[in-house]
Amino acid sequence: MRTRTTRATLLLAALAGAVPLAVASAAGPTGIGRMVVTPTTLTAGSTGNDLTFSYTANRSLTGQTIMDVPRGWTAPQRRGASSPGYVELKRGTCAGSTRIASIAGRRLTIATACKRGHGYQLLYHKATVPTIAADGYIFLTQTRASGRKAKFRPLARSGQPVVKVKGGPATGLDLTLTNVTTVGTPFSVTVRAVDPYSNNAFPYGGTVTLTSTDPAATLPGPYAYQPSDVAQRTFTGVVLRTPGTQTITATDASGLTRQSPPITVNASS
């Protein structure tokens, strides 16, 4: 049985900068310290977000820290304090030599001189969030001590700053269902409430009703979405009974609606 979705579901978050956490937990020595980010959750496509990255050394570090801003986020810059992506450093309890040394593309290099237990803050202003929702965009952070032979090493997985990106408010519905069926054969229809970027909407608690151009169709009753559904529900037991071309439409109580592409209903043999 062939199926069709009315909008492409974009799951290739890695291509947009969501880096698997495994990169920060590879075998071998890890970097020095921990970097924590706040807030930890933002909305896809939102603008004007201020993020604070707080670094704490777990042993003394005199050297450098690098942090890579994932693709899809506003590129960091120091040219204009009022422009998106502006970054600044607050030395906190680290030495006065701690500063932003350079920005090259999406990579910040920070000259770091922090004793054990000391730390600084990196402020990232007016950032635009990627339009693809993902469980974790990692701002990969690495450190190295002074010395020509020293190498950059990523912080431990638990010490990496990670931001979850969730979908925004619902602006439409999306249907996934068969485009060919036989009279009297049950099939399922999956209905997602989506934001403008086709992410599952958040939050969503609408009540969805299915209707059909087939007057003899058997359809499940209305369903009120729960938080555990994460804006997605599969309606089972849909049966079309009139041969020819039919459609199914999903509508929620707020007026969002989506009609399926044509469904070919073959007579039973």
Please annotate each region the language model reported.
Residues M1-T6, R78, K90, V191, ...:
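Short, intrinsically disordered low-complexity segments
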Residues R2-A27:
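Secretory targeting and sorting signals
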Residues T3, L140-G147, L210-T213, T251:
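Intrinsic-disorder/low-complexity, polar/charged segments
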Residues T9-A13, A81-S83, T264:
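Intrinsically disordered and other compositionally biased segments
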Residues P20-A22, G96, T251:
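Intrinsically disordered, low-complexity boundary segments flanking structured domains
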Residues S25-G172, T181-T182, P196-S198, S269:
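Ser/Thr/Pro/Gly-rich, low-complexity intrinsically disordered stalk/linker tracts of secreted
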Residues L42, A133-A134, A156-R157, P161-S269:
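Core sequence-specific DNA-binding domains of diverse transcription factors
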